[in-house]
């Protein structure tokens, strides 16, 4: 049995186990929770520039942040991002494995213990505010501790003390986790003749480093010197996982020695495999519990919208509806960009009325509100929203792209070039920036561009004051200034439908033919049929015919409604089954 145990825990078995865990983490973040990674990629823009680096060099922990931002940019790719995340989540297991070999050679208890930190990191990474820099920080702690215990000679201890200020500068608050871990090791686990002396010196070095950093070298608040960039998220479950991980690492030398002693004489393979399997299984279960399907749908919808894949975004929302404001806002935006707003509005969920068309001004929606204004041709207002977002949150991929696009459309090529230059210093947005730069150098190409040419034709020709407190009031002003702006018109008409203002919506139909419409959009037809049914007077459709499909559908709806209303308790349920995608259902039940 002893030979069997020794064979099981050879290096190749450890590597096999690590590989399995790596692919579990990869599969989870690539196919299940990729929304976590993509969301983080949209929150910051990594720029290859001296200024971007210098901003991180002037504070302890800045280099860990810089490395985290560098790696986060790869989250733009599902596969590359998931590989990066899985690697840094799995790496602590390898570090712990080598640390265990230095602490007590030949003990199999290291097998389950090496999965504790990766399991906790996997659960923590399931929170979409857990940044890559946090994973890097914990890895730095373990790698430096491995360096510290790799040799028992005096020079290694002196090197640890000498390099500790550098560790603090590189990793910030994570260095204090190492200090606690190393103190426990030399005072409680190692317990050599001069342990107290080295422990006292480490405490002294820590104190002196803090004083030098806070009073001489850096202009950071003391609390940042001590804790930055440790994660302190306002989430109880996350804080609990973080606390458990920190305590586990700090006490690890004692935990390992205690368990190694208890495992003497118990060398059966399952004795170590079962706990390891349970730890990994617990990580999977807890990660799945953290998974938020509604958030995942919204972020995936944003991914499609930001990539300009509007038809895919529409189909995605209709198949997997996001029942929150942002999801429905981007669904309506995608409909507007494809000219389907009044034809397909109610095929997706509409739970927020007019609010899902235009987001109100404020910090909550600062990163998303610009898209409505961009869609209807108010490029100055879209520029303002994007600029305010940049001021508040810093460079983000979408605010810099929006600023570049609106500057180009406004003819401010110098400013457009400024934002293009920023994007040229990135990995995933450089190609797009070069395309924009080509149009800056050749403005004639803008007119023929599939996106920008159309947007130029939507820009109002008359000046007016934008009403940002009541943004829906801008739509009539846009239509008056640019009568051919069908996007603004359909936003206006969709707003009337969502607010159930049937009379004005139907009255607007008579103007459609003169604006180039050859047929009445579906949901305006349905509104017209409501008007006709309630008044008995045929509305003026401006010479456009009412489709037979809408008339037949209304007849079926009316017949079903009359039959179903005999049981008021089940009326909505029965009507929703066959008519949830009609304006009539929205009008009667929402």
For each feature predicted by the language model, list its residue ranges.
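Soluble catalytic regions of membrane-associated enzymes that act on cell-envelope
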Residues: 287-457, 461-463, 480-501
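Membrane-interface micro-motifs in multi-pass membrane enzymes
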Residues: 57-61, 81, 85, 108-155, ...
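Transmembrane helices and adjacent periplasmic/lumenal helix-loop junctions
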Residues: 129-132, 150-192, 196, 204-216
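Transmembrane signal-anchor helices characteristic of membrane glycosylation enzymes that use polyprenol
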Residues: 13-38, 205-213, 281-287
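Membrane-embedded alpha-helical segments of integral membrane proteins
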Residues: 193-262
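N-terminal membrane topogenic signal
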Residues: 5-21, 104-109
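Internal/C-terminal transmembrane anchor helices
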Residues: 266-292
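Membrane-interface coil-to-helix junctions
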Residues: 26-80, 86-88
């Amino acid at each position: 049995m002893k030979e069997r145990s020794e064979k099981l825990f050879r290096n190749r078995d450890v590597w096999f186990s690590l590989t399995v865990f790596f692919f579990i983490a990869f599969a989870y973040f690539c196919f299940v929770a990729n929304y976590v990674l993509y969301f983080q990629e949209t929150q910051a823009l990594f720029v290859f520039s001296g200024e971007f680096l210098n901003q991180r060099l002037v504070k302890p922990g800045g280099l860990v942040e810089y490395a985290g931002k560098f790696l986060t940019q790869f989250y733009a790719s599902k596969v590359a991002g998931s590989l990066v995340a899985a690697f840094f989540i799995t790496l602590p297991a390898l570090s712990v494995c080598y640390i265990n070999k230095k602490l007590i050679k030949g003990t199999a208890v290291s097998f389950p213990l090496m999965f504790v930190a990766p399991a906790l990191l996997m659960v923590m990474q399931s929170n979409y505010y857990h940044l890559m820099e946090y994973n890097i920080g914990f890895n730095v702690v373990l790698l430096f501790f491995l360096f510290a215990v790799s040799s028992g000679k005096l020079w290694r201890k002196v090197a640890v003390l000498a390099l500790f200020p550098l560790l603090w500068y590189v990793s910030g608050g994570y260095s204090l986790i190492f200090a606690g871990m190393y103190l426990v090791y030399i005072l409680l686990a190692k317990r050599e003749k001069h342990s107290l002396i080295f422990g006292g010196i480490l405490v002294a070095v820590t104190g002196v480093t803090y004083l030098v950093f806070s009073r001489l070298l850096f202009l950071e608040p003391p609390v940042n010197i001590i804790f930055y960039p440790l994660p302190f998220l306002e989430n109880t479950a996350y804080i609990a996982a973080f606390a458990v991980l920190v305590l586990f690492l700090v006490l690890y030398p004692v935990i390992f020695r205690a368990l190694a002693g208890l495992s003497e004489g118990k060398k059966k393979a399952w004795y170590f495999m079962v706990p390891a399997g349970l730890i990994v299984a617990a990580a999977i279960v807890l990660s799945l519990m953290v998974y938020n399907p509604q958030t995942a749908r919204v972020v995936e919808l944003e991914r499609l919208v930001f990539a300009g894949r509007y038809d895919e975004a529409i189909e995605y929302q209709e198949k997997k509806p996001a029942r929150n404001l942002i999801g429905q806002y981007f669904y309506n935006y995608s409909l507007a960009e494809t000219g389907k707003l009044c034809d397909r509005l109610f095929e997706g969920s509409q739970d927020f009325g007019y609010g899902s068309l235009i987001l109100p001004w404020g910090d909550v929606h600062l990163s998303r509100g610009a898209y409505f204004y961009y869609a209807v041709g108010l490029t100055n207002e879209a520029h303002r929203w994007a600029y305010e977002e940049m001021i508040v949150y810093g460079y983000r991929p979408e605010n810099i792209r929006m600023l570049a696009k609106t500057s180009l459309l406004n003819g401010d090529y110098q400013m457009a070039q400024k934002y293009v230059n920023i994007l040229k210093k990135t990995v995933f947005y450089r190609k797009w920036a070069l395309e924009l730069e080509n149009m800056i150098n050749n403005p004639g190409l803008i007119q023929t561009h599939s996106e920008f040419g159309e947007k130029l034709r939507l820009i109002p020709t008359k000046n007016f004051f934008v009403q940002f407190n009541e943004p829906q009031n801008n739509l009539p002003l846009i239509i008056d200034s640019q009568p051919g702006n069908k996007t603004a018109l359909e936003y206006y008409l969709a707003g009337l439908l969502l607010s159930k203002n049937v009379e004005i919506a139907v009255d607007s139909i008579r103007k459609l033919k003169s604006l180039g419409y050859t047929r009445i959009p579906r949901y305006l037809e349905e509104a017209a049929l409501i008007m006709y049914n309630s008044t008995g007077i045929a509305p003026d459709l401006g010479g456009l015919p009412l489709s037979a499909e809408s008339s037949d559908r209304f007849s079926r709806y009316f017949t079903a409604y009359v039959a179903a209303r005999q049981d008021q308790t089940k009326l909505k349920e029965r009507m929703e089954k066959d008519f949830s995608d009609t304006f009539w259902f929205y009008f009667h039940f929402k």
